[in-house]
């Protein structure tokens, strides 16, 4: 990412002066401190894991018939 696009506070502006997006939508998914697809994947795996623990507990622990 080029440093000339950054504002005085270090953040990227949302739009260029001519109205075009400052960062293309393709780069928004792959650049940054942590890619959004990686955060979403880790979150989805964590949700599936927690649900799996609940289902496992319902069949093996207290509450199983």
From Swiss-Prot:
Q: Name one GO cellular component term.
A: photosystem II reaction center
Q: How does it assemble?
A: PSII is composed of 1 copy each of membrane proteins PsbA, PsbB, PsbC, PsbD, PsbE, PsbF, PsbH, PsbI, PsbJ, PsbK, PsbL, PsbM, PsbT, PsbX, PsbY, Psb30/Ycf12, peripheral proteins PsbO, CyanoQ (PsbQ), PsbU, PsbV and a large number of cofactors. It forms dimeric complexes.
Q: What family, per the record?
A: Belongs to the PsbJ family.
Its localization reads: Cellular thylakoid membrane
The organism's taxonomy opens as: Bacteria, Bacillati, Cyanobacteriota, Cyanophyceae, Synechococcales
Q: Its membrane topology, per UniProt?
A: Single-pass membrane protein
Report the transmembrane regions from the record. 36-56
Tell me which UniProt keywords the record has, alphabetically: Membrane, Photosynthesis, Photosystem II, Reaction center, Thylakoid, Transmembrane, Transmembrane helix
Q: What is its main location?
A: membrane
The lineage's top-level taxon is Bacteria
Q: Give the gene name.
A: psbJ
Name listed for the protein in its UniProt record: Photosystem II reaction center protein J
Q: Which GO terms describe its biological process?
A: photosynthesis
State the function annotated in the UniProt record. One of the components of the core complex of photosystem II (PSII). PSII is a light-driven water:plastoquinone oxidoreductase that uses light energy to abstract electrons from H(2)O, generating O(2) and a proton gradient subsequently used for ATP formation. It consists of a core antenna complex that captures photons, and an electron transfer chain that converts photonic excitation into a charge separation.
Q: Where is this region: Disordered?
A: 1-21
Asked whether the UniProt record includes Transmembrane among its keywords, one would answer yes
Entry's HAMAP family? Answer: PSII_PsbJ (MF_01305)
Listed Basic and acidic residues bias regions = 1-18
